[in-house]
Structure formats: C-alpha cells, structure tokens
Amino acid sequence: MRGQAAAPGPVWILAPLLLLLLLLGRRARAAAGADAGPGPEPCATLVQGKFFGYFSAAAVFPANASRCSWTLRNPDPRRYTLYMKVAKAPVPCSGPGRVRTYQFDSFLESTRTYLGVESFDEVLRLCDPSAPLAFLQASKQFLQMRRQQPPQHDGLRPRAGPPGPTDDFSVEYLVVGNRNPSRAACQMLCRWLDACLAGSRSSHPCGIMQTPCACLGGEAGGPAAGPLAPRGDVCLRDAVAGGPENCLTSLTQDRGGHGATGGWKLWSLWGECTRDCGGGLQTRTRTCLPAPGVEGGGCEGVLEEGRQCNREACGPAGRTSSRSQSLRSTDARRREELGDELQQFGFPAPQTGDPAAEEWSPWSVCSSTCGEGWQTRTRFCVSSSYSTQCSGPLREQRLCNNSAVCPVHGAWDEWSPWSLCSSTCGRGFRDRTRTCRPPQFGGNPCEGPEKQTKFCNIALCPGRAVDGNWNEWSSWSACSASCSQGRQQRTRECNGPSYGGAECQGHWVETRDCFLQQCPVDGKWQAWASWGSCSVTCGAGSQRRERVCSGPFFGGAACQGPQDEYRQCGTQRCPEPHEICDEDNFGAVIWKETPAGEVAAVRCPRNATGLILRRCELDEEGIAYWEPPTYIRCVSIDYRNIQMMTREHLAKAQRGLPGEGVSEVIQTLVEISQDGTSYSGDLLSTIDVLRNMTEIFRRAYYSPTPGDVQNFVQILSNLLAEENRDKWEEAQLAGPNAKELFRLVEDFVDVIGFRMKDLRDAYQVTDNLVLSIHKLPASGATDISFPMKGWRATGDWAKVPEDRVTVSKSVFSTGLTEADEASVFVVGTVLYRNLGSFLALQRNTTVLNSKVISVTVKPPPRSLRTPLEIEFAHMYNGTTNQTCILWDETDVPSSSAPPQLGPWSWRGCRTVPLDALRTRCLCDRLSTFAILAQLSADANMEKATLPSVTLIVGCGVSSLTLLMLVIIYVSVWRYIRSERSVILINFCLSIISSNALILIGQTQTRNKVVCTLVAAFLHFFFLSSFCWVLTEAWQSYMAVTGHLRNRLIRKRFLCLGWGLPALVVAISVGFTKAKGYSTMNYCWLSLEGGLLYAFVGPAAAVVLVNMVIGILVFNKLVSKDGITDKKLKERAGASLWSSCVVLPLLALTWMSAVLAVTDRRSALFQILFAVFDSLEGFVIVMVHCILRREVQDAVKCRVVDRQEEGNGDSGGSFQNGHAQLMTDFEKDVDLACRSVLNKDIAACRTATITGTLKRPSLPEEEKLKLAHAKGPPTNFNSLPANVSKLHLHGSPRYPGGPLPDFPNHSLTLKRDKAPKSSFVGDGDIFKKLDSELSRAQEKALDTSYVILPTATATLRPKPKEEPKYSIHIDQMPQTRLIHLSTAPEASLPARSPPSRQPPSGGPPEAPPAQPPPPPPPPPPPPQQPLPPPPNLEPAPPSLGDPGEPAAHPGPSTGPSTKNENVATLSVSSLERRKSRYAELDFEKIMHTRKRHQDMFQDLNRKLQHAAEKDKEVLGPDSKPEKQQTPNKRPWESLRKAHGTPTWVKKELEPLQPSPLELRSVEWERSGATIPLVGQDIIDLQTEV
C-alpha cells in the first residue's frame, strides 16, 4: 500500500522543466535555419535549442499548404538523443501516407540531396490507428516530418483539399543527454518507455530501443520524490510554485485512460502518513489529460489534496516530538479557523463542544473489507491558550476482523532478458516475455502484455552499396500566367547514396509550359511621335504630337485618352542679356553668343579635324559664363592619318590579305606620340589605333616582330606621360577610357603570348610602365614572381622595384592530368608608374597610395585556390586605413562599399599590413590592383596640396631665425656696415628663399609650369648659398693678405655669390630644355639623365675651394710674421671659424633636403632635414649675431640711443620753452664726450670704430693711416666716432715740433692765455696718471680743454674688478693719447672758458660712412640762451656758480708757436659736412654744455683724491669749493635723487681745492708711453 501511494509522486518533478520548455516553445516555435532541408518552403518549421516540446499537426501542417515540414535539430548527435511520442488519429488514413518522418545528417542545397537519410515510416505507421501511441528514437543531426501533396498529373493547378486524417495527430518530443541526463528528463522518458513497451506487440514494436536512464518498472531510478503540499490551485513541490501546466503529464496509458476525451483521471490512493504519531499528512494526486488537438490544454481543479493522519500523542508523558508538537499546536487552533482547511483536506471536522473537553470522533470504517483491518478515531485538544497542554493521545486504533476471505489477484513474474536482435545489421526486432501467476479467491487476472517487442539497430550493413534515389516529385506549381503562355515547375529531393553508391541521376527540377486561356488584349497606344516645331522661337508657344492606337484584341478594351496632344513650348523666358554668354575670342577662336545651358561648337584648328565644344553655364549669381573648351573631338592630322591607315590594314587582315607596312605604321606612331599629344582626342585616337593593331596581330596572316611589341609598349608609355595628364582628365569626362586601356593591355597580352613561337619570357621596360609576359606549360609550371631576379631596367624608377607580385603555380592546374599536360598558360603583368594619378579616384579624404599593377592569365582559371600575393609600397606618408582594391566592372556597389569608388571594388582582396610603408594584398581573382588610403585629419585634402608638417617646421624655424638676424642687422646697419655684413645678409636671403621654394614645390607637383620654375629657382638658390660661403672665405683671405678692397672687389663678390649660380642654372636649362627640372612626384632635378650633377658638381667644387682658402687663412693666422693687427686677426679667426661650422652644416642640410624632396615617403629624411635646417639657422644666428662682438655693441648702442631720444637729451627743448639748436657735428662730439665717462655707452664707440675700420676707405686714407702708424706715439690719436686721427702740435715748453701737415682737412683748436679748465675722464687710467699730472702742473702751459658729458643720469659706477693690461701705443692701431695742460697762473679762474679763436684750417669734411647714432636724451638742461652764430664772438656762459661773473678773455697776443698749444684734429669722418661746419667753433661747442657741470665736479674730485694718495699737495692757488645753490640747476635734483656715485669716496668731500679750478698739466716727455687698461682702451674715444 505504501509503494502504491508513493508511485505518483515523482511525476511532479517535471513541473519546473515543463513550464520553462512550454513557454519557450510558444515564443519561438518556428525558425529558419541552414542545413535543415530543401530551400525556402511555404511553411517550414525548424526547432533548435529546445529539449522538450509539443505541437499538433493542424498547427504545423495547415490545410492550405501543400509542402510543409517540421524539423528538430539535435544540438550534438554525439551527446544527445532525440525521442518522439506521437498520438495518432483515431481513424485510418484515407490515402497513401502523406506525412513522412525520417532522420538525416545534412542537406546539400545545390544538388537537393539528403545525406544519411533513414526513414521512420515503418516505426510510426501514422495511418494505422490500431496502436494509438507511437514512439521513436533518432540519433542523427535532424529529425524531420514532411507532408507532401500527391502529384497532380492531369491538372494544371493543384487544389488544396480539406485536412486529411493524418492531420489530427499530436507530437511530443524530448532531447535527452547521453551522459548524466537530468532527473526530470529521465522521469518522462521512463514513462514513455513504459507506455511504449506496454503497447508493443509483434506488429507494432516499440520505437525506443535504449535509454540513458535507469528505468525500473517505468520509473527512473533514484530516491523518491519529496512531499507535495496543495495550496489553492497551485501545484507545489519543495516550495516551488507554478501554474497548472507545470503539473501537466502526458501519461495517457495510466489506468482509467481518458486519452480520447481528455480531463482529470481518478484520484490515486492516499499516500503514506508523514508522521507516525502526533498528527501527520497524507496526500493523493490525479492526472490531467489534455483534450486531443488542443495544444497545451489543462484541466480546472486541484492536482493534489491532503489530509491529516496519526493524530494520537507520542510518548507516555503526553509530550510529542517536534513534528507532533507542531501538529498539536496546529490542532490547538480554534475550530472555526480550521474549518476551511479541514474541508480542503477532505475529512470531517469534529463537532464544536466544550473548549476544555476532549471529544473522540466516531470509529472509522474498517480499513479492509476482508481479512484483518484497522479502525481509528481522533480527537482535538481544545485549549484556551497555546501554553495549555492536553493529556492523553489524540488518536486511537483498534483491530477489526472480517470473516470474508480476500481475493488474490493475478501477479506477473519478472521480465525475461531481451532477446538478440533479429538482424545482425540494419533495423531488426528483439522481445522479452513474462509469466502471470493465476488469481485466487476470485481475484483479477494479470493486466498488461505478456510479451514486449521493440526495434533494434545494431549497425549499418556494410559491403552493400546503396545508390541515391529520388523522392517523389512535388506537385506542379501554379502557372506563372493566368492567361496565354506560362510556365510551371516541380522539384524533388534525392536521398543520398551510401557505401560508395551512385548519385541520383536526372534533374531535381522540371519545367513545362502552361496555357490556360487567351488573354484579352486591350488597345494600346503606339509611341508618341516627335513634337512638332514650336510656334515661337522663345516665350510662350505650342507644339503638337499624335499617336496611333493598336488593338483591341480578344475582347480587350479600347484605347483610352486623346489621339493627339499639345504642350506649351518656349515656356522658358527669352534669355536676358546677362544670361547669354557674350562673344568671346578665346584660343584664337571666336565664340558667338550662346544662351546659358547650350553648347557652342567651332572647327578645330588647322592641324586637327573635328569640333571644339564649349558650354555656356550660369554661375551662382545667375550670370552666364563660358566654361573652358573641350578638345575631346579634336584629332590632330598626324594621328588622324595613322588612324585611317590602321583601319585599312585591319580591313585587309579581315579579308585574309597579308599585312605589309604595319611595322612602319607603329614606328611612325611611336615618333609622333614621343612629342606628346596636342588634344585629348589624340589619346582616344591612339587607343583606337592600338586596338586595331591588336586585332591585326590576332590574325594568322601577320606575325608580330619583337620590334612591334616594343613599339606597342612604348606607345602605351608615351600615352601615360606626365605631359598628357590634363588630356587624360579631359578624356575621362567623355567616358571610362581607363577601362578601355585595361582591356587593350589584356588583349595585347593574350595575343602576343599565344603568338610566341617558343616558351619564353618577354620584358619591356619604359619610362611609365613595365610589361612582363610569361608563356609556360601547366605541367611544369612554377610560382611566378614579378619582377624576376636579374632583369635589366633602363629607368631609375624600375631599377629597384618596390612592388612585387607572386602567382602560385596552382593557378595553372585544371584538375585533369591529360589537360594539364597539353595546357599552355600566358601570364601578363603590367606595372603602371603613374596611372593612378590619371584615374579620377582621389577625393578629399582618400588617395591612391600605390602604383597600379595588372595581372592577366590566359586562359583564365576557374578559381584561385591559392590567393594572388601583391606587395605594394606606399607613395605618400600620413595616410591611414590602407585598403586593397581591384578593378571590377561587374561588381554592383552596395551600401557597405566605400562611396565613389566607381568600378574599383574592395571585394575579393584581403589587406595585410606589413609595415608603415608596405602593404600586402591577398586576392582571389585576377584583375588590376592598387591601394586606396585615407588621408589623416591634418592632411584631409587633395593629394600634395600641403607639405608635411616636418618640412613646414624645419623650413619655418630656419627662416624665422635667419629673418630675425636680417632684421637685427638692418636695424643697426649704420654701426656694422661692412663687406662681411653684406655677404651675410645675401647668404641668409638665399637660405630663406630656398626654404620657401621647398614648401611651394611640395604643393605644385601637378602644375608642370610652376613646378619647373620652382625646381630651377631651387637649383639657383641652393648653389648661391654655397657660393656666398665661398665669398665670405674669399673676403677673409683678402683681408689677411692686405689686398685693397674697393668697388671692383665688391662687384666681384656679387658676381661670385649670384652670378656663378645663375650661369650654372642657365647652362643646365639651355642644354636640357628644362626637361630634367621637376618630375611627376617632386619639384627638383630629375634623378635620371645626369642633371643632378649640375648641382652636385658646383657644390663639391665650392666646398673644396673653401677648404683651400681656410687652410691658407689658418696658416696666415698661426705664422709668426702674419697679422700684426689684433682686431684684424680676431675678425679673420671669427670668419674662418664661421666657415668651418656653417659650411658642413649647409652641405648636410641641402643633402637631406634633396633626399626629403625626392623621397616623400621616407619620414627619416624629412626629420633629418628639419633638424639640420633648424640647426643651421640657430648656428648662423649664434655665430654672426650672438657671439659677434660688433653686433652686441651695435645693439647696445641702438638701445642707448633710443633711451636718450626718449629722455630728451637731443637738446630739443628746455624748461622755459627755448629751443636748442644742435648741429650734427655737435651731436657727434657730444656722443664722443659721453663715451669717455659712461661705461655703458662704450658699445656705441666700439661699433662706430669697427664700422669705420670695416668701411672701404680710399687709397689716400690707407696711406695716411700707414704714415700715421709709423710716426711717434705722441702723434697718434683718434677723434670721437668716425674721426680718424688727432695731431698734436707742441708748445714752447713741450719739446716737440709740429707734425707734418696732412692733405685732409684739419680742425685746429687754439687755447687762450687765460687759464682753462682741465681734461677730465673716467677709468683707472686717470688713477695711474695722477702723479704725472701733479708733477707737470708747474711747467705745463696754461691751457686745457674740458670735455663734458651730455647727461649725468647715465653715469654708472665703474666695475669692481676689471682685467687690466698694459699695451704700448705704437702696438695698437686705435690707441689714444691724452694731452692735459694746466696754467701756472692761479689768479685766473679755472672755470673761465677760452676765447673764441677762428679755426686754423678749413671746414671739416664729412666721412663716407654713416654718422653715429644720435645721443640718448639727457635730463632737462638748464635754461640757457641759444648759441650765437659762428661769425659772432660772444663769450659762452660761465661754468661757475650763477653768482660768479663769466670771464671774457681777450684775444691771444703772443706768437702761437710759443704761447699756445695747438691741437690739430684730422676729422675724416666729417668730410661730408664740410660746408655745414666751416664757421663752427669747436671750442665754443665744448664749453656750452653747462649741464655737464655735475659730472665734471665728481670726476675732478676723483682726480684730487688720487693726487692726495700720491702725496702730491696741490698749490696754494686752489680755492675751496663753493656750495651750490639748491634747486637752481635742474641737475641738482637728479644728483640728490641718485646720490653720490659709488666710486667717489666720502673722504673726498672736505677737500679744499675746488674741482673746477684744477690746474692744467702737460706731459713731461713727448714719447711717454701710457699704460692703458683693457676697457679704458675701448672707452677712451676723444682726445684734445
């Protein structure tokens, strides 16, 4: 009894799985899949990825469809097995089997063949209703059920009848794993096996042969199912809830079967109580059978119900176990709370009584109707609270005896083992039997079969070939036309052969004509006739046209609509004057007025035939304009004649006449095309000639010679010359002429290859293409590589091939041995050098990044088993997304293809990047190949519109640095003007021009004229940069050798720097006719033809000559008897060092520039050029600007001049608004005066002196300088700025005579008898001279000249530490001599200026050089009157205090040779101002600078302090220094603001002698040698 109750429990294990499978099956029941069966069908269902499902035949095989199928796909036949359960229709089929079931491995769509077909019609027997259920087991990839319409032999249109009886069956399927199947799958499979075996017999064996589950009596092995608890209408198992369908089962073979009607089955027996005491739970279940034909149908009601059991207490003390206690607690609830639950469990609840009483229920019915049984009664514990415990058991049992004897039912013994399979191979049968023990005492006999039979299939029968056999033809399809002639077709499938059997013979499709009826033909209008002429020429008019009706026929309708119609013509208004292109004379042709939108045509020029076309269009503003004319229909007379001759030879060849003169025609065309084409029509004419020549070569009456082949290829190369680029672009507008070119070359390879008598190779290398033809047998073929090793190329571009093609030998195999032995293949490979630039494939974002390669094999192979390998070298840098493309005219562009590719296609090729500069293409077809690349974001423009960023950076940095150098030189030109500066500026201009031309040349490769000009000028400027370096070396050599530099020499410099490069370029252009200048890829000298030596040769010669000059200059510098002038020696050394640094860097720069320009793909050369070019600019600026002392001083002088001009030191205004007139000469003297006291202004002096030395001097000046240098030291001096010499005439007390008079104009300064102020200067030199100054006071003359600084604001302290060295005067070409003299008379005031004396000589002459820069503006000067005119003699203002009267000394009374010191100044720098300074008194100018008094006092105090340190006491005539009146002079405020200079010691302040009364001193001896400090030599500039 316990075993019977537990049996239905495991059924509920399937609930979660069934829910999931049914939901997935409903959502995705039908899905199309590959290899599922024959192609598209009206209704085909493919189930895959499902492990359980159900369908009905009515849903899968609709009545209105003739060919339907249902296919179940096995995920993996090695791991899973398919099982199917079919519930058949209750009535037999009315006809032959219409639904077939079979399994197969795969299906070939091309031949409509099933492979590995095995039929299950014998297993299922759908038309036999004697066995309501049928099962099968399938182990192949697909399990299919297909319904086929019976063939219709007498009807043209198949009729879909009502659904047959076989459409009423239903199917359940299950996919079970062969290893470790799931428990739920085994539960269902075991029940299917139980049902299958139960219904099996000899005529209907069971289709389930074996299972991976261990089934015991129809149940899967394993532990029993867990408890189930009902709750409402939900089926629960282990607390997992689900809908009613979760509890659905398909066990239709259980007892009380309701398989035909559907609904609930009978309740099972109560199961075992869950507890032995204390109250337990018993359950029972029932099964729902869905109604036939209703998929997924369920039953209403509860699947499981339960009741309490074993309510008696457990244990003697009234305590129960935990389970019983739980039941007690549950039973202790109120009766009204348990009412519904007890009713649900199905047993009556006890009567409600006293809450404290325990009432027993009545004794139950005896558990057995015969034999010994049990009776039970129960009671409830009614308590007021849950804490109260009831005493005594809750359940009681007692025995009940019945006198009746229980019947013994018949029982089956165990099944015998399965018998062996009836067949050793193929499908057979096996069975087993069992014995029934007879019943007793009226028991029931044994139920169920005594014998079970099932199919067995051990293995396929070997050794017996099974030929493929066709399935039945499908029904004819509907006629393609409802009337008149139509077509019908039907198909069939082949069951594939096995064991080496033959394939199905015949066609899988048949077609036949069908004719249902004559179609009525309606009347049909014929095409409209052309429109008549318009009634008006413009404006509103009308046109008429008519048509004819054809028909009707066979009852058709008549033509509808009018027979004629009218339309307006000239609806467009008459064109306005601005919408008509005016008459134009363009290209020596008169174009008449033409309205916009029309094309005008005129005859071609006299040397051509045809028409020139020119279209008139409207611009965006609606103004008519002429488009450029097109010469696509113009053919030159020469090309036209050759075209006519070629057509005549072709006509002869077609008639079988031998060809004579064909070679001459080709040779003539080579000569004509060598000079280029005049019109785009010449290109088309040449292509037509070559096409006709190919047809002539194809004829057997003419055999082409090697010369013909070479001329043919040469003509193709001439067509692709760079000069014909514009002609190609114009020809492309008329049609795809590139396609014609590819076809022409392919036909030529075919003809020439097969007309070769021997198996040999042919190579033709020209300037623009390389053609290779191989003829080889298929039997001995090897891999072909292009280009082959050891080939001879004439052009530089083809000597080192960068592109390679590999054709595998598998291409030449036909698959048949006999055919391979007799087959001969011709392989043609063409490498086009520049065809890619002619094709209209470049866009704003894409570029053709390689050469074009065409590969042809004749006869063409069916397919390429080994891909064709092509390696391309990239032509441009900065590109991405390299894509292999091929020429395919049959390919229809799709949405996924790149736009605007035209006949180019990316299909059929696979791109394999090799490195940054190479790409490999693997293609599965033969065609024309190239690489299409995408420009980067910064290069998103047309090809070669901008140079690379590297070139821009290199040229830009170099040009900017050199331009800055030029600007600096121009700004300080007056100070550094010299031959070396002129050479440097020309050198910089040549480099800047070269950089600009390099960048321009990168953008003009397509413009032939501009590119040629850029190449020529680049050649010129490259050479000029080398020549200017040579010019600098030459100038340095002439300087160290002492040659005179005059205008003739300077002209020679210009001729060398600019003339020699111009001569070389002119000769090169004249000899080559500019053909070598510029190529297709760069604007520079062509690497072919030797033109590059026109640059390399002169550049190398310049380098060698420069080295020789450098060696000579170096020897001159290091020799003992070399250069004695230190300044000249320093300049020569600097020039030599500049050449040694700049020249190698210049050579490296231009060498890398040539490599970068000619090989634009190499980023290394561009980077090297950018580095060298930038470094060259920095080095030139460093050598000639930053490290050049002259430039530094000139820049400082320029800055100081600007500051002084801003401060108003030019004397332009005063406090009271009085203007001060300062002449240029006064400014020169003022600049020199300020140089003495101001260290910072020393740069002005240095730059001025350097400029004076470097300035070209007249021969007389050179002689004077040499004579001056040979004289005594006392006669040597220089004037400020550009004053070249100072001549000092001795006084009576000075033992020196007057110097010889020089031819230059001298400015003579005479002293007055009155005592004058002394010379004051700054620097350590005065400290060393203090002792001499003191000792010479008594015997010196009473005269001196005071040189005052312009401003005190610019005075700065002397540097703390300054290197000192003593240099003898006669060793320095620029030495200065200071002549100081004081008067012995102490009574005369030292501040009294000298009386004005007329100059002893004529006016000074201005020098040829530029004057020095204007002095920087000083602080506001004191108010003073304007200087008197030169012809008047008023006394200048006194230098003393405002209260002191000015001294006015009278004229000189003694002889000038005894009483005066005459200082003669040779003013060569003022020669150009002779007329302006004729009446100027130099002494008056020197003493009118009252604003220098402050500085004068400070310097005088310094001299006094130095004299005191040498213990030289001043004379008693010294006067104490008077106090200055505050705020009476403007410089006093500055003095207070800035304080006392740092170099003035404070102990100098109490000195008694006034600095303004310093006595004059004179040199004790004439030949005194003055030790000069280094910086003082530079600062000391003016001597009096």
From Swiss-Prot:
Q: Which GO terms describe its molecular function?
A: G protein-coupled receptor activity; lipopolysaccharide binding; PDZ domain binding; phosphatidylserine binding
For the Cytoplasmic compartment, the record's topological domain ranges are: 970-980, 1030-1052, 1115-1136, 1188-1584
Subcellular location(s) of the protein: Cell membrane; Cell projection, Phagocytic cup; Cell junction, Focal adhesion; Cell projection, Dendritic spine
Region annotation N-terminal stalk following vasculostatin-120 cleavage which is not required for signaling activity: where it falls in the sequence: 927-943
Which SMART domains does the UniProt record give?
A: GPS, HormR, TSP1
Tell me which family the UniProt entry assigns to this protein.
Belongs to the G-protein coupled receptor 2 family. LN-TM7 subfamily.
Q: List the keywords (alphabetical).
A: Cell junction, Cell membrane, Cell projection, Disulfide bond, G-protein coupled receptor, Glycoprotein, Immunity, Innate immunity, Membrane, Myogenesis, Neurogenesis, Phagocytosis, Phosphoprotein, Receptor, Repeat, Secreted, Signal, Synapse, Transducer, Transmembrane, Transmembrane helix, Ubl conjugation
Query: Phosphothreonine: which positions carry it?
Result: T609
Q: What InterPro entries does UniProt report for this protein, alphabetically?
A: AGRB_N, GAIN_B, GAIN_dom_N, GAIN_dom_sf, GPCR_2-like_7TM, GPCR_2_brain_angio_inhib, GPCR_2_extracell_dom_sf, GPCR_2_extracellular_dom
Please list the residue ranges that the record marks as compositionally biased, kind Polar residues: 1453-1469
Signal peptide range equals 1-30
- Grouped into one coarse class, the protein's main location is membrane
The protein in question is named Adhesion G protein-coupled receptor B1
Q: Where is the composition biased (Basic and acidic residues)?
A: 1501-1522
* Membrane-spanning residues: 949-969, 981-1001, 1009-1029, 1053-1073, 1094-1114, 1137-1157, 1167-1187
The scientific name of the source species is Homo sapiens (Human)
Q: In which tissues is it expressed?
A: Expressed in brain (at protein level). Expressed on mononuclear phagocytes and monocyte-derived macrophages in the gastric mucosa (at protein level). Expressed in normal pancreatic tissue but not in pancreatic tumor tissue. Reduced or no expression is observed in some glioblastomas.
